Amino acid sequence: NNDLVEMLTFAKPDIIAMTGDIIDSNNTDLDIALHFAEEAVKIAPCYYITGNHEAWVSENIYSEFEDNLIEMGISVLHNEKVLLEREEAKISLIGIDDPDFFERATLGGIQGAIIETKLSPLLDNRNYNIVLCHRPEFFDNYAALGAELVLTGHAHGGQFRLPVIGGLIAPNQG
């Protein structure tokens, strides 16, 4: 995480989007995730959405994690939007919870429908819509509803990670 924090500091982003799976349900160590979050929020405003790993830990562990994020000043978006403004530009930043928080469905059609139900009322055609949603495999759903930019997680290694050709595509994940 120190390298990531250093890269973020150098990049000077306007915002930092955390798109879930910041904790690992198989090896839950909140301190690692919270240390990263604590450093990230010093760099830029941070917006966080849940991933499937957050849904898979106990409710007590997740509640403790989220409470800590909020105390640090991180905006946790649960199927809601915030308006970002700069000069004349308005951006709707929309955060959708991972569908595993709603239903332990494994069929893509069911999860896609859950996401559409949560996302549709939040999109605003007067603004540029940036959607934070954990699941890249539902990109077609997001685009069909009117999302102009979608930032996702879930791929654990990223769909982008180029230097010496890492990442780019994760099978069955968008």
Pin down the residues of each PLM region.
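Short, flexible loop segments at the rims of nucleotide/cofactor-binding pockets, characterized by
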Residues: 23-27, 55, 105-109, 128-129, ...
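Binuclear metal-dependent hydrolase catalytic cores centered on His/Asp/Glu-rich metal-binding motifs
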Residues: 63, 67-74, 86-129, 139-140
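Active-site metal-binding loops of divalent metal-dependent hydrolases
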Residues: 20-22, 52-54, 80-81, 96-99, ...
